[in-house]
């Protein structure tokens, strides 16, 4: 039971991390960032 919950938790965290890193890259427009993630991404990369 515990191992199953741990697997689910790992699976969800991996999805969240990948979506966090992939989503801002695709639609971002640094001249007019739509979201806070985009703005942060653009600040980091100049």
Swiss-Prot record:
Residue positions where Histidine amide is found in the record: 45
GO biological process, one term: negative regulation of potassium ion transmembrane transporter activity
GO cellular component: extracellular region
Domain of life: Eukaryota
GO molecular function, one term: inward rectifier potassium channel inhibitor activity
Subcellular location: Secreted
Residue numbers spanned by region Essential for toxin activity: 40-41
Paired cysteines (S-S): 28-38, 30-42
Record key words, sorted: Amidation, Calcium-activated potassium channel impairing toxin, Disulfide bond, Ion channel impairing toxin, Neurotoxin, Potassium channel impairing toxin, Secreted, Signal, Toxin, Voltage-gated potassium channel impairing toxin
Tissues expressed in: Expressed by the venom gland.
Main location: secreted
Pfam family, one: Bee_toxin
Note: Negative results: No activity has been detected against the following channels: KCa1.1/KCNMA1 and KCa3.1/KCNN4/IK/SK4, Kir3.1/3.2, 15 voltage-gated potassium channels (Kv), 10 voltage-gated sodium channels (Nav), TRPV1, three ASIC, three types of glutamate receptors, and three nicotinic acetylcholine receptors (nAChR).
Function comment: Toxin with unique selectivity to KCa2 channels. Potently blocks human, rat and mouse KCa2.2/KCNN2/SK2 channels (IC(50)=27-140 pM), and moderately blocks human and rat KCa2.3/KCNN3/SK3 channels (IC(50)=0.6-4 nM), and human (IC(50)=0.7-12 nM) and mouse (IC(50)=28 nM) KCa2.1/KCNN1/SK1 channels. Does not show any antimicrobial activity.
Protein name (Swiss-Prot/TrEMBL): Apamin
């Amino acid at each position: 039971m515990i191992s199953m919950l741990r697997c689910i938790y790992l699976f969800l965290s991996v999805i969240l991390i990948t979506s966090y890193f992939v989503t801002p890259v695709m639609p971002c427009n640094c001249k007019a960032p739509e979201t806070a993630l985009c703005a942060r991404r653009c600040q980091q990369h100049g």
